[in-house]
């Protein structure tokens, strides 16, 4: 008899988990030796790890789009649900960006399966808020059951899934989830959308003497944010894809007491927080020399209340029609802006 019994959580917890890497959580019995059954129980757990799982898949499909065959599972098109240890692990990976979320559980019999991420996510979103059971057979077909709803979907062998690369945890920095989320949101708008210049689609993360500098630019504007780090901070200078940072920002919480460890290698960056690991390739090459773009030799310098300035821009925008790209004209005269 094949059993997997996972930690208890409700449908909300599952939805949250799927947003993090891929899948479902918690599990229960199986009728045949070749089957694996995962059952979600209606008791809430920490919902944050699960939240990241459903998130992971839609990004991949937007960015990469194709459902590849098993050997080419470049693989965020698929959720891999792995219950081969004492925890249930959800993984999504497209070889550029990968995420893994762990849910603790009592594993009665081990197993794993790869499931179409988009389809699985959509099914979970639409199910009633009650127990969910996922059963697989020897042909990697999956049966998802919740109350009177049943879905049969074809899966693939979890053995052929492309797992996340091992990262050497040498150079690292630590900051709160709130700080990282804020830093990303205050700079990411300045990166380029297309990849005519790939360097502009990423952000510079430079750590020097305990200070993190994050820079984004697109050739027309530049955003720079400096933050003083506490604790260990190794000097690094890397360029992280903007897509990676945008997606990480979505799953970080605003808690100043929850921390993120960021590890850097020559080719990858690893973000560790809660029960989630996110691995991304770095953009290769030397970033622009920011110091040469900035100058203290200016004709006019203005200090202004930020909120009042933003409110004024919002009011001026009322007169600009949607799709119109006319600039806002700023006049500075007699102490007024």
Where are these regions (language model features)?
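Structural preference for solvent-exposed beta-strand-turn elements
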Residues: 66, 76-337
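Low-acidity, Ser/Thr- and Arg-rich intrinsically disordered low-complexity segments
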Residues: 2-20, 24, 28-40, 44-55, ...
